[in-house]
Amino acid sequence: MLSEKQYLDLYQSSSRVIKKNSAEVLNAVRDAAFEDFRRLGFPSRKVERYKYTDMSAIFEPDYGLNLNRLEIPVDPYEAFRCDVPNLSTSLYLVVNDAFYCKALPKVELPEGVIVDSLNKIAAENPEFIGKYYAKIAKTDEDGITALNTFLAQDGLLIYVPKNVKVERTIQVINILRSDVDLMVNRRVLIVMEQGAEAKFLFCDHAADDKNFLATQVIEAYVGENASLDLYCLEETHYKNRRVSNVYIEQQANSRVNHNVITLHNGITRNRLDLVFKGEGAECFCNGCVIADKNQVVDNNTLIDHQVGHCTSNELYKYVLDGEARGAFAGRVLVRHGAQKTTSQETNQNLCATKTARMFTQPMLEIYADDVKCAHGSTVGQLNDAALFYMQQRGVSREEAKLLLQFAFINEVIDKMELEPLRDRLHHLVEKRFRGELNKCEGCKLCK
């Protein structure tokens, strides 16, 4: 309760400052979100979806917050070049929880496409933002989402109009920077109109060696016949705590490709809630996790088949070394009347040491009788016979271990449809297994 009380006291004492620096449409839901948090609090391990990670411990330390929206000095040209060779991107920066618009090269986007500050657009067009903001990210169902909603002051809006295809990948670099331990609360709102197509690459980095706590809520609306590719890559450091809740709503015949990659972190908790609202939609959800030392990565997913004739595919793979701890809980819910549903959920895990720990819980909950659904999970160690075979042919034990780990994780990397990113991940993962990569390789401030 101590950790909850400090956030309740914070809002009661600082709500005027928070609202002063935010658009009215964002403020309109704050008080209700605050009351939801007062009622729900931080989810305990008794809550099924949070049984593997102690959320109160993550939020208990005393972090600073930039409620007065003081400008954080950055040099985007020197610091934040998160390069993916051979991938042409439109580059945007979010520093802590604020959209950064200064001294960036002008980005040419198709007519009508918007990538801008959520707070800015909310002030300019409150009717549009009010139609979507905090609608599928329900504060009365999750304490973390409620906390983010009453504290968040800015973030990112991405809007793609009807039948517009964005050819270049939109790359968003989320940078954590501070001279003191800091908490940031970031919002992302993605609206894809009917027939729209776009690819997004979100890269999370920590530029300073401080204790960071980042909460993030992403709401994505994918219209009829629209296509959304979302790649989320985390390369922070061991002092970083990240809690990300992603909510996706799909209409008829839409397609979503959601990929979450964790290469460096401290404690990471990713939640994905995806709901099918129209028939003929499909989603592909992939997760790639590499963790060692005392790192923790917890992925929790819910795929909600509310209508029939939809397809979902999930593949999450973990490689855990040292005393790392991983968790995966994936629930596929097929509701009454959701006939002709097809679903495959797979979680495969490799513990490279005896001290690494993995918790896995794939779940199917089916209330329709004409479906094709399967799920499975495995947890194992390196194959001693394969190691021996390779050593007999002159391969050192360490090199053999690396090759087997790389072959194991390769399956999920190869499902990434962005070929340049796929090639980049092969390079980063190999260096990670060799112990040559301690944090982000591409950003100068991260060195």
Stretch-by-stretch model annotation:
Residues 106-115, 121-395, 409, 413-447:
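Conserved beta-strand/loop scaffold segments within soluble protein domains that form the structured core
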Residues 1-146, 315, 321:
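N-terminal amphipathic, basic helical "cap/leader" segment at the start of enzyme domains
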